[in-house]
Amino acid sequence: PGANLSRTNLTLRASSTFGKDDRWSIDAKVQYINTLAENRPISGARGNNAFYTIFNMPTTIDIRDFSSPVKDEFGEMIWWSKGGINPYWSKDYNPNKDSRNRFLMNGSLKYKFTDWLDAEIKAGSDMYFTEGEEKLYAGSPTNNKNSRYSTSEKKFFENNFSFLISGHKDELFGKFGGNFSFGGNLMERKSTGLDNAMGKLTAPDLFSLANGDKKDLSITETYIHKKINSLYGTLGINYNGWAFLDATFRNDWSSALNKENRSFFYPSVSLSWVISDMVGKVGKGMPEWFTYAKARASFAQVGNDMDAYQLYNTYSIGSDPNGNTTAGQGKTKYDADVRSELITSWEAGAELKFFNNRLGVDFAWYKTNAKRQLMNIPLNNLSGYDNMKVNAGNIQNTGIEIMLNARPIETAQFSWDTQLNFSQNKSKIIELLPGKPGMQYALGGSDALQVYAVAGGAYGEIWGTKYQRVEEGEFKGQLLLNESGLPQATSDKHKIGEQQPDFLLGWTNTFNYKNFTLSFLIDGRFGGDIFSFTNMNLQRSGIAECTAPGGKREDIVVAGVIKDGNGYKVNDQSVSLERYYKALATGRAGI
């Protein structure tokens, strides 16, 4: 409620050619973007997220009953429970707003030496200034009924200066033609930020950072400065218009790495062979129904650096509960000798067209290996750090991509184009750290549920607790219930799923009739697992359909056994559906 977003764009562009034979050309563009936002929705499973509280609201309650009034005679929010937030109250008493002014400027100057050789210089700048404000009025349970005030400022700019010399000439030597380019780029990026928050206002609803105790004031300053200098180039050779060899290179020098490892080089090579053109020029030509045939193969490497200030451990300034200045170290141990990441890929494929381009197929196979990845591996807490930045890992992805396209119908006024895309990717963690098979690296998650990269496994495995079961004997495999007849979670985590889908499938159709076009896409992701925290919370709150099968909530007897002095006995205790689903959704991730 009350959300509003307005955006204003202004663009000015000018271009011209001049000089002898119009060999000089200039192009300049300036763009201004102003964005104003009010009451952006708060996301996540948090008490001040109105949508989160609505999801967990009993269906027997009409939310419109809380639209007016939203505050009682004591100034406190009116809501159906002690937790969560009334969305109508949030609109007026937990507002937020932000504004951004962004400027994009770029210009180029180009000179043509000949009809096949030219040079160009470019300059570009991207800068924006953002201001934000958030207010929380007194009476909300999300801040112990205290009011809160916060502001934020951010400044960002990135400048790029580049040059490029390029040339292209057919029949350079006999039937050989070629092209080349050589250039460079200077990139500089800088950002600053200031976040202020007064967690508890002394005078309620008087929104000032000075209205409160210093111990409740939080100030966070950020400063990031990074540069990357680059040289790059391309070289292409073609023979008679049907055989093509292309190569590229790039070398970056990043300020985020130390002097010894600051430079990193990555090349690529590709070869393509247009078989149909070759046959047409040196032979009798392709059959009439066989329109086009092309084969291709490529090798490429890509290097990546990291964010600034991750080489040396420094101390950050803060304060203790009494307001005294303190200095503390971060939780990550840095290594000044880390290098850039390296991603190596191989690809091969073919493209075929039939019946004057009415039917076509494109097939590709690829393999990529990401090595020397910049990772934060866990450390023993006795070291004083939680993790350490290292180069490690070898993650391999292999897959295929197939595209079928056809024009089944074509008349003077109507045509139908259809395209079917299929892709399949298989990932494997070849290695995380040398000599540590089976090592787990956390990618994200919450408490009992984690997404891991596991050495020897697939990327993005889902690990979590499972139901406790009897491991041997007469009742082997049955649920091991607690004394109340409810399921129990294992103490350790197990692999319970994989994020990776079995394959992706997409179908696009385009219909053209005279000057009208209609197009639609059907896209599908088949296989793969997800864990839904939304469903878990709905079950815990009794909102999910499964918590009242057939619209009834009758007690159930969970199938399983209970441990007793003589071993196990079959469970005969009945429990309410409320207790059952709360047991399943225990903690933050449930069983």
Q: Predicted segment positions?
A:
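Glycine-rich, acidic and aromatic/proline-enriched surface loops and short helix-turn segments
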Residues: 1, 237-241, 368
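Transmembrane beta-barrel architecture of outer membranes
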Residues: 5-11, 230, 264-268
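Surface-exposed loop/interface segments of Gram-negative outer-membrane beta-barrel transport/assembly proteins
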Residues: 15-102, 122-229, 256-257, 277-345, ...
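Transmembrane beta-strand segments that form the barrel wall of outer-membrane beta-barrel proteins
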Residues: 1, 245-254, 408
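Short, solvent-exposed loop/turn segments at secondary-structure boundaries
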Residues: 2-4, 257-261, 423
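C-terminal transmembrane beta-barrel domains of outer membrane proteins
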Residues: 245, 296-297, 363
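Residues on the lipid-exposed face of transmembrane beta-strands in outer-membrane beta-barrel proteins
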Residues: 12-16, 105-111, 163-167, 182, ...
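Glycine-rich, aromatic-lined ligand/substrate-binding cores of catalytic
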Residues: 498-533
